[in-house]
């Protein structure tokens, strides 16, 4: 009887140790951020630096991978648990056969500007002029197409010249070779310093578009839903922290951008404080817009459905449980 009692005590102790250690174990997670600029990557930096990943049981290793497409490719290859991505890259990865899904969002519109020569007086003046553009299927390409559509023009109304990435596009206009281009906040600032002007502020058009989002694999969702759930919660808290802790946010931006100019970071902070989505819910309408445009040059997109690219169960949970309302100290929405 004594032996039985002793065995029970030992079992209880061992069980307690196992349970206790399991609760303390953090899941090792590898996540790519795709820009070393002070934009949407800040949410990942913040979550790491202020301990939000750790709070939700994630032993996070952040990895810089230059570009959304490369991040998605690494995810599909099994090198990552999550990646930051632009919606277009997630769509392309899925259409190419990748078992991936968008699980949360940071920005649901296009934080782009159409900038050009001072001689361009209005958006209507873009008609017939030359534009420095990116290759089809990139976010910059979609931004150009949607900006034109938003002011009543089409891609056929301009002389599009494929130049490439942001520095090359800006240079083509600054040097006078082409008339206008599409740029993010940093490109806009550079262009304005060189004498270019903002012709269209796309954020003001509020065109739904899946810009920055967190993507994972279908396998991760099926086999480790709690890890995905924790990631989504951490990203939601990172957005809240960004919006409410300006000084900390800017200090972390300075760290990851290697001491970028404070004034420039202030401007970026103000812009993204408005752009970042509180409930981290992906924009289904934005994904639909992307598929409609992509269908013009990609037959696979014409047959695809929005639900093929997104899994909203985790962001739905945030809404239903009142997680977001609690963060922002407001009455629960239903």
Say what each PLM segment does:
Residues 9-20:
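Bacterial N-terminal signal peptides
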Residues 139-154, 234-265, 307-313, 317-322:
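Ligand-binding clefts/hinges and TM-proximal coupling segments of bilobed small-molecule sensing domains
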Residues 22-28, 329-332:
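Bacterial Sec-exported substrate-binding components of ABC uptake systems
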Residues 1-10:
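Bacterial N-terminal signal peptides that target proteins for export
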């Amino acid at each position: 009887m004594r032996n039985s009692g002793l065995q029970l005590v030992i079992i209880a102790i061992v069980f307690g140790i196992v349970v206790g250690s399991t609760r303390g174990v953090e899941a090792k997670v590898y996540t790519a951020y795709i820009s070393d600029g002070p934009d949407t990557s800040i949410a990942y930096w913040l979550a790491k630096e202020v301990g939000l990943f750790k709070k939700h049981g994630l032993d996070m290793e952040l990895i810089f991978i230059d570009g959304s497409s490369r991040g998605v490719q690494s995810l599909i290859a099994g090198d990552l648990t999550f990646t930051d991505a632009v919606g277009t890259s997630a769509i392309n990865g899925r259409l190419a056969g990748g078992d991936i899904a968008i699980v949360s969002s940071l920005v649901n519109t296009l934080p782009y500007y159409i900038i050009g020569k001072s001689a361009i007086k209005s958006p209507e003046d873009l008609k017939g002029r030359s534009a420095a553009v990116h290759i089809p299927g990139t976010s910059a390409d979609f931004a150009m197409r949607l900006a034109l559509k938003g002011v009543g023009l089409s891609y056929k109304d301009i002389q599009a010249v494929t130049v490439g990435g942001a520095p090359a596009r800006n240079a083509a206009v600054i040097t006078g070779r082409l008339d206008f281009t599409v740029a993010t906040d940093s490109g806009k600032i550079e262009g304005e310093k060189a004498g270019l002007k903002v012709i269209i502020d796309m954020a003001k058009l509020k065109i739904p578009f899946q810009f920055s989002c967190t993507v994972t694999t279908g396998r991760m969702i099926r086999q480790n839903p709690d890890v995905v759930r924790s990631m989504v919660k951490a990203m939601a808290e990172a957005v809240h922290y960004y919006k409410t802790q300006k000084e900390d946010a800017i200090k972390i931006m300075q760290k990851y951008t290697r001491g970028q100019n404070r004034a420039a970071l202030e401007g970026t902070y103000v812009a993204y404080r408005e752009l970042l989505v509180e409930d981290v819910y992906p924009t289904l309408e934005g994904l639909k817009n992307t598929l409609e445009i992509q269908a013009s040059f990609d037959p696979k997109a014409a047959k695809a459905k929005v639900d093929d690219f997104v899994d909203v169960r985790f962001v739905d949970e945030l809404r239903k449980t009142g997680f977001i309302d609690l963060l922002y100290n407001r009455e629960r929405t239903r």
